[in-house]
């Protein structure tokens, strides 16, 4: 339950002048000359102070004969829900084909650009621009997966033209649209299998860097898993440089005090990359819960989505999804087996004690 606060009328007026969204739910203000009452954060033009009166809630303002503002809808009981509704509306506007600027978006949801940007990021964990880019990337993937042409897919995703897409092609899909459509066609990926302390390991590398580190017990299963990631990629020869890279990866997997300095080719959605980036900040020897990880990226309600992002990790140990446990501290699922997860955590705990 929200704790009641005692504000003077002068303090309330300052909140109205600042259009402070944090004051929503604390009180409403009414304007005698218009007969309308509003939330403190309402974007309507300010009235003169002498024409403004304050009420504890919408019920009192209604009882005094005032009408609710159609713009800020102060009669809604839950101010937090009201703000969430605005962000939800902003998300739907960002998902339209026509790009929208922050200023235009703020105007449509009746907020200042500054407050919208801050509240949007606090609610979704992403900026409005990043949300729009992630949505475009999703639509592009879906369209390409359906067999649509590259040009049609680019336009359907909301890019104004092909050149706008190609300037951001690498960060949108991690490869060209044509390569994505054909399962990584013409994408050179080399791989090697080796033993490590955790069993068999498959290390794969693209032109951009290490793109997969997979663990298992059966070579055929590991190769099949890689082929599902890049079904049409070319199998590049394993040259001496790549063999050295494989040795560095194995050394890093076997000894956690040997950090991997090789470039990584991390491919995933904007949300997945956000989760994976947060995972890499968890210190060796420590664990967090899925809820704590969701909180860390600013999305406390996205616990299941966070767990799915952990399960989609393609770079075992380097992106340490094994450091995420249930809320009660017990081990949950792990892409490469719960027993490996337990082994990794024991090893890291022992290393920290030395």
Curated annotation (Swiss-Prot):
The record marks 128-129, 178-179 as: Cleavage. CDD domains: ATase. This is Bifunctional transcriptional activator/DNA repair enzyme Ada. GO terms for molecular function: DNA-binding transcription factor activity; methylated-DNA-[protein]-cysteine S-methyltransferase activity; sequence-specific DNA binding; zinc ion binding. It catalyses: (2'-deoxyribonucleoside 5'-methylphosphotriester)-DNA + L-cysteinyl-[protein] = 2'-deoxyribonucleotide-DNA + S-methyl-L-cysteinyl-[protein] + H(+); a 6-O-methyl-2'-deoxyguanosine in DNA + L-cysteinyl-[protein] = S-methyl-L-cysteinyl-[protein] + a 2'-deoxyguanosine in DNA; a 4-O-methyl-thymidine in DNA + L-cysteinyl-[protein] = a thymidine in DNA + S-methyl-L-cysteinyl-[protein]. Involved in the adaptive response to alkylation damage in DNA caused by alkylating agents. Repairs O6-methylguanine (O6-MeG) and O4-methylthymine (O4-MeT) in DNA. Repairs the methylated nucleobase in DNA by stoichiometrically transferring the methyl group to a cysteine residue in the enzyme (Cys-321). Also specifically repairs the Sp diastereomer of DNA methylphosphotriester lesions by the same mechanism, although the methyl transfer occurs onto a different cysteine residue (Cys-38). Cannot demethylate the other diastereomer, Rp-methylphosphotriester. SUPFAM superfamilies: Ada DNA repair protein, N-terminal domain (N-Ada 10), Homeodomain-like, Methylated DNA-protein cysteine methyltransferase domain, Methylated DNA-protein cysteine methyltransferase, C-terminal domain. InterPro entries: Ada-like_dom_sf, Ada_DNA_repair_Zn-bd, Bifunct_regulatory_prot_Ada, Homeodomain-like_sf, HTH_AraC, HTH_AraC-typ_CS, MethylDNA_cys_MeTrfase_AS, MethylDNA_cys_MeTrfase_DNA-bd. The keyword Aminoacyl-tRNA synthetase does not apply. It comes from Escherichia coli (strain K12). The gene is ada. The keyword Nucleotide-binding does not apply. Residues 181-354 are annotated as: Methylated-DNA--protein-cysteine methyltransferase.
